[in-house]
Amino acid sequence: MSTLQGLLDALQHHKLQLLCIGPLVYACVSFIIKIVYRIYFHPLAKFPGPKIAAATHLYEVAWDYFGQGAYLYEIQRMHEKYGPIVRINPIELSVNDPEFYNVLYVGGSVRKTNALPSFGDGMDFNGSHGMTVDHDHHRLRRKPMEPFFSKGSIARLEDRLQELTVTLVQRLHEYRGTGRVLRLDHVFAAMAGDVVNVLCIANPTMSFLRHSDFNPYWYELFHTLIRSMPLFMNFPWVIKIVRLIPTSLLEKLDPRSQMFRDWRMMSVNHIIDAKQRKERGLIFVNEEDKMKCETLFDHIVNSDLPEAELSVERLASEAQVVMGAGTVTTARTMDFLAVRILLNDSVCQRLRDELREPMKDFPERIPSYAELEKLPWLQACIKEALRLSPGLTHRLPRVSPHEELIYKDWVIPRNTPVGMSALFMHMDPLVYKDPTEYRPERWLEDVTPEMHRNYVPFTKGSRRCLGVELSYAEITLVFASLFGPKGPKLKLYETNESDGDPACHFLLPLPRLDSKGIRVTVEA
């Protein structure tokens, strides 16, 4: 009896310690059970890949967050070791086989395709079409936007692009002969941001190009967000905590965040105005008026979307995603292209020679995009830049909710995220000779069907990038103007290929993080 009483007394004495240790023991046991399940009993347990990647998402987080976006290179090493299909985290597969690309990235008529929820959850932009998980819901939101971004529509909006291009060239000429060093990557971010503003909300008070130094905070804000994406995407609760922090405190911690808030508020005001104009029956009286004034959100508000999809909150999320995607992706490709052209005298001179005649009357007359896309060397330069520096190098996982996917002898279970990287497609040495070299002439020589098959800078399928035509038009107009006879004479300043090449592959690729940027002077 005394022994039992002693045991009870001991338990009572250590009650507090047990209450503290108990949850910890439970958490550890649960974690171990989860790891054992993932490695040996999960539906993906049969697929090859390192056990640590199968066990925990922390392996990916370590490579991307602490390794500066290096998980893509680790995935490449996995493929070299384990083969064309590998398990890269507890729930996801990666395939490195060009033949499978058109099987995975398909249109809605072939198969319904869902997105990976962590994309939208991590950035808290589930209201935008690009972050919408369900195939049918995504299609509902995307369909009204497609006409605005079609090639014909971009041609009608071309006057706005040309005006911004003229402003860009005029601003660069202000530096002519001064010896002042200019950040060209800031310039391109400003240009891309202004294009999105003009086409989306047309706010006259917002102009990055007219900012005294092209508003470097705009560039830095997006780069900071991109570097945080591995954390947000793997731990979606982080962004929800950030949302709880008062705006005033956030702006004290990082004053640059005010620009993102300002963009959202301008978008909200424009969307409210567009909805009020619709309610009052105020529409564009003719095609010319529509061509000059209609914005993306005018277009969406007047579409046949159900009212539930036209909430100000949802459309404001759409505006933020369009601004982010439309700024960073296009600007990064222009960064890469400018460096490669300026470093290669023969490429640069051939481009200047081709542009001498068509651009001779700039800025009084600017050739249309339709005219400029017929210039073979200019288009080859752009296409090769998009091959080596696509706006998205992330693996872009797709989910088949209703059908198993078949890859060779492998049966991929339904609802399994499967991704492929454009960079792997573009760097295939069996398709592109000397794949790491910038050689625009490859697109003018013996172009094979495999080269076209592997060329996927904007991905394919029902979730293909909406802004393909806008991106091509913007890059074409900018570089035709910069390297035409009336363009500024740019000269690189302490800048090399590594300052423009994609090196850190977060959701969006960035150059090496210790780069001082793409610096140039403008010669007299």
UniProtKB/Swiss-Prot annotation:
Transmembrane annotation, as ranges: 16-36
InterPro entries: Cyt_P450, Cyt_P450_E_grp-IV, Cyt_P450_sf, Cytochrome_P450_monoxygenase
Gene Ontology, cellular component aspect: membrane
Keyword Glycoprotein: yes
Topology within the bilayer: Single-pass membrane protein
Major localisation: membrane
EC numbers: 1.-.-.-
Cofactor(s) the protein requires to work: heme
The family this protein is said to belong to: Belongs to the cytochrome P450 family.
Protein name (record): Fusicoccadiene C-8 hydroxylase
Species of the source: Phomopsis amygdali
